[in-house]
Regions:
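Helical "lid/coupling" subdomains associated with nucleotide-phosphate turnover
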Residues: 4-8, 12-131
Length: 131
């Protein structure tokens, strides 16, 4: 499937037209937040709950995409295993921003250090499901 087709499927499955808050979770989003804040080291407390406005994020994404992975790897907030893949993540985030802009009024991401595994665990705990 093309990326465009996958985005269309996402919108049909979960309409976002009424969304006011968009949360970016873990991975690329937390790295982008650290970069946007100019952190000298990765700081989960500074990242969790931070806001990335689309206008500023677009500038950061273009800068990041233009850097070769060996230069990205020199930045202490970019995990060594992410330096070569963060460019692809940046392209994906740009696509997500475009999707959001076309379908709702939100113009920023709020960043969460928590990821899908945290959500699954919280859901199971709420259900009282033993594992």
């Amino acid at each position: 499937l093309s990326i465009r087709r996958q985005r269309q499927m996402c919108i049909r499955g979960r309409p976002i037209s009424k969304a006011r808050t968009i949360v970016g979770c873990a991975g690329t989003f937390t790295t982008l937040s650290a970069l946007a804040q100019g952190l000298e080291r990765y700081d989960a407390d500074a990242i969790h709950g931070s806001e990335l406005r689309f206008d500023a994020l677009r500038v950061l994404l273009q800068q990041l995409i233009s850097l070769p992975s060996d230069v990205r790897a020199l930045n202490p907030v970019i995990h060594p295993g992410r330096a070569d893949v963060i460019g692809g993540g940046a392209v994906a985030v740009e696509g997500i921003m475009q999707l959001i802009e076309r379908n709702c009024d939100a113009r920023s991401f709020f960043i969460s250090e928590k990821d899908i595994l945290d959500g699954i665990i919280a859901g199971l705990a709420a259900e009282g499901t033993p594992r």
